[in-house]
Amino acid sequence: MAKLAVTLTRSMIGRPENQRVTTRTLGLRKMHQTVVVPDNAAMRGMINHVSHLLTVKEIQE
């Protein structure tokens, strides 16, 4: 099963609360922090919601 490496590349300062909550739910707390998440519909939906703040790479295992 594929996984996604998600990196927070834009600051959370001045962002709406719903975007802050989404990034925290993805496990991202600091800029340039990278987390590995499973590639499923729920994660893809969260990533699409804040895609302008993230960099996403697919990881094959």
From Swiss-Prot:
Protein name: Large ribosomal subunit protein uL30
Source superkingdom: Bacteria
Matches recorded under InterPro entries: Ribo_uL30_ferredoxin-like_sf, Ribosomal_uL30_bac-type, Ribosomal_uL30_ferredoxin-like
Lineage, highest ranks first: Bacteria, Bacillati, Bacillota, Bacilli, Bacillales
GO BP field: translation
Protein keywords: Ribonucleoprotein, Ribosomal protein
Pfam families tied to this protein: Ribosomal_L30
Keyword Ribonucleoprotein: yes
Entry similarity comment: Belongs to the universal ribosomal protein uL30 family.
Keyword presence, rRNA-binding: no
